[in-house]
Amino acid sequence: MNSPLSYNNVIEVTDLQRAFKQGEHEIQILRGIDLIVRRGEILALLGPSGAGKSTFLQAIGLLENGFTGSINILGQEIGSLNDKERTAIRRDHLGFVYQFHHLLPDFSALENVMLPQLIQGKSSHQAKEHAHFLLNSLKLEERLKHYPSQLSGGEQQRVAVARALANRPALVLADEPTGNLDEATGDIVLHEFLRLVRRQGSAAIIATHNMAMARKMDRIVTLHDGRLIEEY
């Protein structure tokens, strides 16, 4: 079997569909999505609230079941994997950034970024060294020992970015990553996020309703009513 690093396409999605039951009715959320994202590519998933962006990210992030179609990550067909194998894919190859930071409140900024590395099997020294590098790169060198409650919103989200990149994921999934920040702070966080993603050579899919933000990515696809309707 080829190494995951040998695959140029980080993710390939074919005919992805998702429907929910609402009483006697079936509500179609995703309607046959096809998408390929290549190694190192940063893709904007543009669409209004309710378009299906979060549902799509949950599907390709292996956070939900109940989808039909095919999801292939680094050459592995997800439908053929058991729960343990899917967890390993999430842990080793995917990173997540959300609108709200979801940091562990009883852990410092440094510890929040070390933790996913320790879970992956890194030594404490390795995890600490890489966490230092990421947080320093995000201009948080004076905040390493601070707890989330002691950080500003922008600082919290930068820690969340560092945590998402801690295991050098092949693919980062970000759902409105600056949606809870004011415009000026959001621009700073996004700039630093994109800089680090590119430096690590990760691919990324960033869901947003903001065209100005989307234009900063390598490619834009538009999701509307569960369908990809534009690409540019």
Curated annotation (Swiss-Prot):
ATP binds at G47, P48, S49, G50, A51, G52, K53, S54. The keyword Cell membrane applies. It is found in: Cell inner membrane. Its EC number is 7.6.2.-. Keywords: ATP-binding, Cell inner membrane, Cell membrane, Membrane, Nucleotide-binding, Translocase, Transport. PROSITE patterns: ABC_TRANSPORTER_1, ABC_TRANSPORTER_2, LOLD. The keyword Methyltransferase does not apply. It is an enzyme of class 7 (translocase). Residues 11-232 form the ABC transporter domain. InterPro entries: AAA+_ATPase (IPR003593), ABC_transporter-like_ATP-bd (IPR003439), ABC_transporter-like_CS (IPR017871), ABC_transpr_LolD-like (IPR015854), MacB-like_ATP-bd (IPR017911), P-loop_NTPase (IPR027417). Its main location: membrane. GO terms for biological process: lipoprotein localization to outer membrane; protein localization to outer membrane. It holds the Pfam family ABC_tran. One of its GO terms (molecular function) is transmembrane transporter activity. GO terms for cellular component: plasma membrane. It is a peripheral membrane protein. Belongs to the ABC transporter superfamily. Lipoprotein translocase (TC 3.A.1.125) family. The complex is composed of two ATP-binding proteins (LolD) and two transmembrane proteins (LolC and LolE). Part of the ABC transporter complex LolCDE involved in the translocation of mature outer membrane-directed lipoproteins, from the inner membrane to the periplasmic chaperone, LolA. Responsible for the formation of the LolA-lipoprotein complex in an ATP-dependent manner. This is Lipoprotein-releasing system ATP-binding protein LolD. The lineage of its organism: Bacteria, Pseudomonadati, Pseudomonadota, Alphaproteobacteria, Sphingomonadales.
